[in-house]
């Protein structure tokens, strides 16, 4: 009697079934990963990309703003007048800044000088200065605004606008800081 070796076929079938089961598990895992990527991760990355694009456009606008602000040239002295040339569109003279006392009061120019045309002559400027000096003298008892002493009882007895700050405290200077290039 010849003995046959143990059945090799059941072992091959068993291995084939185990391989098929493992491949099915791998396929299920890949399907779950694909679903997670397409439903959760890709939309989140797209939203993040939109936010980054918005931030990038805002930053490029700020970069342009700062670059253009660094190109500004501040005039420290008035420019020399250009030679007189005829223009089709004559420009009105620039408005003058009002004169202010050390207490912050705006000095009004007398009405009579408003009626006179401003030709910029030396006599007219001297005349305006005299009127202004007279106005200061009448209002404050002194023609010098730099040595102003309040004689008004309302200015001396007015309470401070804040309990933490005395009226004699100077305003802190404004400080602007820019990053160095």
Curated annotation (Swiss-Prot):
Name of the protein in question: DASH complex subunit ASK1
Cellular localisation: Nucleus; Cytoplasm, Cytoskeleton, Spindle; Chromosome, Centromere, Kinetochore
Task of the protein: Component of the DASH complex that connects microtubules with kinetochores and couples microtubule depolymerisation to chromosome movement; it is involved in retrieving kinetochores to the spindle poles before their re-orientation on the spindle in early mitosis and allows microtubule depolymerization to pull chromosomes apart and resist detachment during anaphase.
Domain of life: Eukaryota
Family from the record: Belongs to the DASH complex ASK1 family.
Subunit structure: Component of the DASH complex consisting of ASK1, DAD1, DAD2, DAD3, DAD4, DAM1, DUO1, HSK3, SPC19 and SPC34, with a stoichiometry of one copy of each subunit per complex. Multiple DASH complexes oligomerize to form a ring that encircles spindle microtubules and organizes the rod-like NDC80 complexes of the outer kinetochore. DASH complex oligomerization strengthens microtubule attachments. On cytoplasmic microtubules, DASH complexes appear to form patches instead of rings.
Stretch list, region Disordered: 77-181
Biased composition (Low complexity): 133-165
GO biological process terms held by the UniProt record: cell division; mitotic sister chromatid biorientation; positive regulation of attachment of spindle microtubules to kinetochore; positive regulation of microtubule polymerization; protein transport along microtubule to mitotic spindle pole body
């Amino acid at each position: 009697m010849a003995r046959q070796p143990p059945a090799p076929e059941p072992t091959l079938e068993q291995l084939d079934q185990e391989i098929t089961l493992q491949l099915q598990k791998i396929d299920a895992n890949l399907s779950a990963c694909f679903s997670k990527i397409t439903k959760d991760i890709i939309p989140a990355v797209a939203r993040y990309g939109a936010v980054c694009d918005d931030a990038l456009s805002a930053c490029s606008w700020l970069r342009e703003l700062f670059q253009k602000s660094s190109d500004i040239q501040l005039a420290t002295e008035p420019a020399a007048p250009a030679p007189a040339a005829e223009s089709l569109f004559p420009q009105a003279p620039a408005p003058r800044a009002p004169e202010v006392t050390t207490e912050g009061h705006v000095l009004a120019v007398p009405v009579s000088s408003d009626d006179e045309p401003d030709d910029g002559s030396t006599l007219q400027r001297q005349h305006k200065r005299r009127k202004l000096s007279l106005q200061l003298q009448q209002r404050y008892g002194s023609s010098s605004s730099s040595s102003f002493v309040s004689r008004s009882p309302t200015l001396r007895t007015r309470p401070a606008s804040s309990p933490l700050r005395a009226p004699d405290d100077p305003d802190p200077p404004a400080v602007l800081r820019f990053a160095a290039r």
